[in-house]
């Protein structure tokens, strides 16, 4: 029975590279000279440090296009609240979401069941396995999920016949 997996992955070297390039651009910009503006990446958590909310917005305006250039989907980012740090400094934590979380997986399974396509969907950890009788039905399922789920980057892989 043909099947495929729906996952959500982030290319970590590309993510680290885009953060490094953004940091070098921030260091070279005249309006950031003498400030504490920088971006840190630890595991799946980016932290933006700056002197004001405006600086954080400017840093995002540098970082997001760099991520797009490196083919890192910016929809995987989940922004936290801006926090005041010592003095007049601010920071913002940005989570890099990897894997299909349970709520999204349930939404995908419900979407496929309600569509009346002859496929079975099962949640397997941080992925959703979809299997069906024919390859054409699986392609319809992929098209349906791509059309309906647009707020989170999904990859379709591990095809088996």
From Swiss-Prot:
Matches recorded under InterPro entries: DUF520, UPF0234-like_C, UPF0234_N, YajQ-like_sf
Pfam short name (any one): DUF520
Keywords in alphabetical order: Nucleotide-binding
Secretion signal span: none
Molecular function, one GO term: nucleotide binding
Disulfide bonds: none
GO CC field: cytosol
Function: Nucleotide-binding protein.
Family to which the UniProt record says this protein belongs: Belongs to the YajQ family.
Protein name (database record): Nucleotide-binding protein azo2183
Taxonomy of the source species: Bacteria, Pseudomonadati, Pseudomonadota, Betaproteobacteria, Rhodocyclales
